[in-house]
């Protein structure tokens, strides 16, 4: 197994911190707030690749579990993961890994990045909505109306902005990432 470079460690930590900061920019609209955290998840996956992207989000989740107030509204602790938003938080790891895998596999083309981010969006939305249904004991229709539909416009905007940034930043970062 290859050792990580100092740059790879730093950029991975940076994306964990970026997710923590952007998650605090939230619009509370019910049990699942609108945050900019997913913007960072998309960027981490597409820019760092599957492994480092997923690791950056795993660091974010682990920081929250051990008590660092990184989750939305400065919450922390394992209890947050067992609450209604826990599936979305855990889904960040899956989404970043999936986005990174798809971009690496199919290239840094505009349409590939969009499709990869849509796949990541579907992955974390699926895990989050399933967990919400379980933890809140609701049905599919109610969960979709509470957890998915209100977020679609904002998530589409985040994906568009992330794609633009990735297209600009990827050529620069790839010089330093192996």
Give the residues covered by each predicted segment.
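Hydrophobic transmembrane alpha-helices
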Residues: 1-54
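Interfacial helix-loop-helix junctions of multi-pass membrane proteins
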Residues: 68-74, 131-145
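Alpha-helical transmembrane segments of integral membrane proteins
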Residues: 6-15, 37, 55-56, 87, ...
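Generic alpha-helical transmembrane segments of integral inner-membrane proteins
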Residues: 13, 17, 21, 43, ...
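Short helix-perturbing small/polar motifs within transmembrane alpha-helices
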Residues: 14, 21, 78-122
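Alpha-helical transmembrane segments and their cytosolic interface
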Residues: 1-13, 146-178
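Membrane-helix interface segments
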Residues: 5, 50-55, 106-112, 139-140
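Interfacial aromatic-anchored transmembrane helix boundaries in multi-pass membrane proteins
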Residues: 23-33, 61-95
């Amino acid at each position: 197994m290859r050792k990580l470079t100092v740059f790879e460690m730093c950029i991975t930590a940076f994306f964990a911190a970026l997710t923590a900061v952007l998650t605090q920019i939230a619009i509370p609209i019910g049990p699942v707030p609108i945050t900019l955290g997913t913007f960072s998840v998309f960027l981490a996956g597409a820019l760092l690749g599957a492994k480092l992207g997923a690791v950056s989000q795993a660091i974010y989740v682990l920081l929250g579990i051990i008590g660092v107030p990184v989750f939305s509204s400065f919450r922390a602790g394992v209890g947050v993961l067992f609450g209604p938003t826990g599936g979305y938080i855990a889904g960040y790891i899956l989404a970043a890994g999936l986005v990174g895998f798809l971009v690496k596999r199919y290239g840094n083309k505009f349409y590939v990045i969009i499709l990869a981010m849509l796949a990541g969006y579907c992955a974390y939305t699926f895990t989050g909505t399933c967990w919400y249904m379980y933890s809140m004991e609701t049905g599919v229709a109610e969960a979709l109306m509470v957890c998915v539909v209100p977020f679609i416009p904002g998530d589409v905007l985040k994906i568009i902005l992330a794609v633009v940034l990735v297209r600009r930043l990827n050529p620069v970062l790839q010089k330093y990432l192996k």
